[in-house]
Regions:
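Helix N-cap/coil-helix junction residues
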Residues: 91-92, 175
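Short, solvent-exposed loop/turn elements at beta->coil junctions and helix N-caps
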Residues: 21-25, 103-109
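A short coil-to-beta-strand element that immediately follows conserved catalytic motifs
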Residues: 93-103
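Conserved Nudix-box catalytic region and its N-terminal flanking loop in Nudix hydrolases
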Residues: 23-34, 44-84, 88
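A structural signal for short, well-ordered beta-strand segments
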Residues: 36, 100, 120-124
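Nudix hydrolase/Nudix homology domain
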Residues: 59, 63, 105, 113-178
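Acidic, metal-coordinating catalytic segment for phosphate/diphosphate chemistry
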Residues: 1-42, 50
Length: 178
């Protein structure tokens, strides 16, 4: 069954509910999305080599998802959607203090599919056990922030387009400063 997501303007203003497939087909429709970067007490960031219809087998932030319009008529908050993604993708059940560090827009088309998103850049700290669901990713790794930034700069093709855009937000506010 197709999930229902929230179409929005470039500034994130809600427009209407749409099937996820509409948001990602052809030119797509701009819609609300989330990417989350988890870091640990050592200052490392958690990356995932994602299984993805459009951007398969490249590095992503820790997790990415969309706030959903639920069957009960409510919309997930950014925090609820982020917690859902971390639970589904890594079996993280404990609460993580999440912060939204800002939004960015991006569009990328590959064949008949696309990404057309107004994306929240969420972050949170976690030092617990990870059990990645093999249906969502090939592997994960903890990496030093500085090494991560150097690799994104030197090998941008190894990263999802939203990672490259999200890094700009993180650098602008000083989150990825050494």
């Amino acid at each position: 069954m197709d999930q229902t997501i929230l179409a929005c303007s470039d500034s994130g203003e809600f427009q209407e509910y749409i099937p996820k497939s509409i948001g990602h087909s052809g030119e797509g429709r701009r819609h609300l999305a989330i990417t989350v970067l988890v870091f640990n007490s050592k200052g490392q960031v958690l990356l995932q080599k994602r299984k993805h219809k459009v951007f398969d087998n490249i590095w992503d932030f820790t997790a990415s998802t969309h706030p959903l319009h639920l069957e009960n008529g409510e919309d997930e908050t950014l925090e609820q959607a982020t917690e859902r993604a971390l639970k589904v993708e890594y079996d993280i059940k404990s609460s993580i203090l999440l912060r939204n560090l800002g939004f960015f827009n991006y569009f990328q088309k590959i064949g008949s599919l696309c990404e057309n998103e107004h994306c929240a850049m969420m972050v949170g700290e976690y030092d617990g056990i990870l059990n990645m669901d093999p249906s969502v990713g090939y592997e994960y790794k903890w990496i030093d922030k500085k090494e991560f930034l150097e690799d994104v700069r030197n090998n941008p093709e190894n990263y999802a387009p939203w990672v490259r855009e999200g890094v700009k937000v993180l650098k602008r506010i000083g989150f990825l400063a050494s």
